[in-house]
């Protein structure tokens, strides 16, 4: 509590803006949305807020999860989970396209992905109609800077940090003739330590589980973009992406039971875990502009694959003797194939009428295979209860249309996305009390309209008022619908729910933005109404422990107020503040909960940026997030303060950067479950207190 009280005034005097010596006008875009805004060294404001990673001194040496925390109302936890305006399910895109590696394993990816690779992160609560309607509070998009012939043809990066951390990268930028070639590669290696503890009390008594684990992830990431100016009005681009994360992990799980007031060890379970996550993508884009530059046709086709392989070896040790009393293993193979096609056409008519129409198609095919063995009487035997074969298919076809009208300082847009969605699950699994495998085949289809409306008024040259309504959806990932119980990680046993329904969200926002060359002020009021809200729930399985699952937690609504302000009083100093406060309400009485729950939650964050000399820059930033509501309890507050300093050499061709993350080690996450029959306290933490030194050279 004392640490919290000390952090609040410290963070309150910080700012959200990222350092820039000279603020400049900047046109920002996310897919087909273009917003004119003022840029404070990396953070661009407006309907779409975009952060330039290499302008952020504490984030550029970190990961994408670290950088997300610098955006207004966006917070990430120690495992890469994202909270945006109180929602844990924002849409995640790469260059406006959904990817398989940004689904249920996105946390693993975000805490390993070097921040400098996708060096622009964007956020918007009112996405363009040309984007998929998935995501609760809005979307977060990863993209790269558009390199031109005026930029450096070669950029080299080399970094090292405490606890055996290393990073190296290169960017190649060439523009021969009509070609535009940009290739990037980054390698990152770390040695990570994690701690975990869980105390569970139910009718059977109290048990305590502790686990200290270490991991060595190796991450390779590369992409290549080749553009060609076919004509003065046509640009064709092909793009490829490859990502490999491979690591080994060891954990020793201590299982204890409270007997007569004394905590007695029951068993030590050793886990030797190897994981390999591999993703690749191939993409083609065609941009065509007509005689009127506002008339354009955009076509995008993307195929991306994500593979997940996990090998587990277990040994159970008797604490009293140190002897191994049981051995078993467990293997998981998962493969995802994603196809995406979008065709968007925009036409500007007389009197400032603008029409946009298009099609978006998404096709998913996933397979999941699990199996395991156990050592019995000195021989390895297959364990039928660990076997699972699961296939998931989804077909989503979406037609869209939007009409916009501008007159004077007013503008209005009305649009709709009409979607036909079909999906099928096909699984074979075995329960504890049935000897043969149980088949389950289930298919569903639906048609749904996603309407939207936006009204805007420009009050003067610097101010704009907007009122918007949009309907969005959260679709369960394929693995969330698999009824099989995954016991690969004893600290987090997981079971899918084949009866999960899509979560539907109605969002209304009233926002105002005021921007000059040195000051930006942006307050927003928002409201979200959710039907079939998807949230985590823990099940009490008695002597078998607890099992996590996903469930539709009835009706829910959120009222919130967001405020961000940035100010550059003098050339060498940039200040600001961002805060978000909201009332989160969960009404689960329709599914058996005894009462409606609510909590006032919020976060505050910011940074201060100083140009000490023309070649020396300093940044401090931090955030604090309050307790968060869950269906069965809460997640306790957490915070982080970071610092970064850069020194330029050789006429700014060489930069040395020192960053320190999570200075006060405040990211520890405590989850509390408090129900009539189950009380649980779970604490997770990892060594996020990291110091990095990075050298960047521009040819």
Give names to the regions the model predicted.
Residues 21-57, 77-79, 87-89, 125-127:
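Short, acidic, small-residue-rich periplasmic hinge/interaction motif at the N-terminus
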Residues 64, 70, 98-125:
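Short acidic/polar hinge/loop motifs at secondary-structure boundaries
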Residues 64-67, 108-110, 123, 133-157, ...:
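N-terminal periplasmic accessory domains that precede
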Residues 65-101:
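Extracytoplasmic beta-strand/coil segments of soluble accessory domains associated
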Residues 223, 227-245, 273-430, 448, ...:
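Face-selective signature of the C-terminal outer-membrane beta-barrel domain
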Residues 338-342, 495-497, 501, 507, ...:
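Outer membrane beta-barrel strand-and-loop segments of large Gram-negative receptors
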Residues 422-424, 457, 461-507, 527-547, ...:
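Surface-exposed extracellular loop regions of Gram-negative outer-membrane beta-barrel proteins
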Residues 647-699:
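C-terminal beta-signal and adjacent terminal beta-strands/loops
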């Amino acid at each position: 509590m004392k640490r919290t009280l000390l952090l609040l005034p410290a963070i309150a005097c910080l700012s959200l803006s990222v350092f820039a010596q000279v603020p400049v006008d900047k046109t920002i875009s996310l897919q087909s949305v273009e917003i004119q805004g003022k840029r404070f060294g990396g953070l661009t404001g407006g309907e779409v807020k975009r952060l330039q990673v290499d302008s952020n001194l504490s984030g550029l040496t970190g990961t994408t999860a670290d950088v997300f925390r610098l955006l207004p109302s966006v917070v990430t936890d120690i495992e890469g989970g994202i909270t945006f305006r109180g929602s844990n399910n924002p849409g995640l895109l790469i260059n406006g396209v959904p990817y398989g590696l940004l689904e249920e394993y996105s946390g693993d990816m975000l805490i390993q992905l070097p921040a400098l690779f996708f060096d622009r992160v964007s956020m918007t609560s009112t996405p363009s109609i040309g984007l998929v309607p998935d995501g609760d509070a809005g979307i977060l998009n990863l993209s790269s800077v558009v390199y031109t012939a005026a930029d450096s043809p070669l950029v080299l990066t080399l970094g090292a940090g405490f606890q055996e951390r290393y990073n190296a990268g290169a960017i190649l930028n060439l523009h021969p003739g009509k070609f535009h070639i940009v290739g990037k590669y980054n390698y990152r290696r770390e040695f990570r330590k994690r701690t975990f503890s869980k105390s569970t009390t139910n009718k059977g008594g109290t048990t305590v589980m502790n686990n200290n684990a270490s991991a060595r992830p190796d991450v390779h990431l590369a992409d290549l973009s080749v553009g060609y100016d076919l004509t003065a009005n046509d640009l064709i681009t092909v793009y490829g992406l490859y990502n490999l994360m491979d690591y080994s992990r060891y954990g020793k799980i201590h299982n204890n039971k409270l007997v007569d007031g004394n905590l007695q060890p029951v068993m030590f379970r050793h886990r030797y875990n190897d994981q390999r996550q591999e993703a690749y993508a191939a993409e083609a884009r065609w941009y065509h502009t007509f005689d009127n530059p506002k008339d354009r046709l955009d076509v995008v086709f993307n195929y991306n694959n994500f593979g997940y392989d996990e090998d587990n070896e277990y040994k159970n040790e008797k604490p009293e003797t140190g002897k191994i009393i049981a051995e078993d293993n467990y293997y998981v193979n998962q493969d995802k194939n994603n196809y995406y096609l979008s065709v968007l056409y925009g036409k500007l008519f007389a009197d400032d009428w603008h029409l946009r129409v298009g099609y978006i198609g998404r096709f998913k095919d996933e397979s999941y295979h699990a199996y395991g063995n156990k050592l019995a009487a000195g021989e390895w035997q297959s364990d039928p209860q660990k076997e699972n074969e699961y296939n998931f298919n989804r077909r989503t076809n979406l037609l869209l249309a939007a009409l916009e009208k501008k007159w004077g300082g007013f503008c209005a847009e009305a649009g709709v996305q009409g979607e036909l969605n079909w999906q099928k699950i096909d699984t074979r699994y075995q329960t504890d009390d049935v000897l043969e495998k149980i088949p389950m085949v289930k298919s569903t289809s639906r048609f749904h309209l996603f309407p939207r409306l936006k009204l805007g008024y420009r009050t003067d040259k610097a101010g704009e008022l907007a009122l918007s309504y949009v309907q969005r959806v959260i679709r369960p990932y394929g693995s969330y619908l698999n009824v099989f119980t995954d016991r690969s990680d004893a600290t987090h046993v997981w079971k899918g729910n084949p009866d999960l329904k899509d979560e539907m969200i109605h969002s209304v926002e009233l926002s105002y933005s005021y921007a000059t060359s040195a000051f930006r002020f942006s307050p927003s009021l928002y409201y979200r109404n959710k039907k079939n809200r998807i949230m985590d729930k823990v099940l009490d399985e008695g002597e078998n422990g607890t099992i996590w699952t996903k469930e539709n937690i009835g009706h829910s609504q959120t009222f919130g107020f967001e405020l961000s302000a940035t100010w550059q009083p003098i050339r060498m100093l940039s200040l600001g503040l961002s805060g978000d406060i909201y009332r989160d309400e969960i009404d689960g009485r329709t599914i058996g909960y005894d009462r409606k729950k609510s909590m006032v939650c919020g976060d505050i964050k910011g940074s201060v940026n100083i140009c000490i000399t023309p070649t020396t820059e300093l940044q401090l930033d931090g955030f604090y997030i309050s307790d968060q509501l869950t269906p069965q309890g809460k997640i306790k507050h957490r915070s982080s303060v970071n610092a970064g300093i850069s020194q330029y050499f050789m006429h700014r061709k060489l930069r040395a950067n020192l960053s320190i993350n999570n200075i006060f080690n405040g990211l520890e996450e405590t989850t509390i479950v408090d129900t009539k029959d189950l009380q649980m306290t779970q604490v997770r933490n990892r060594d996020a207190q990291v110091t990095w030194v990075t050298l960047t050279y521009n040819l």
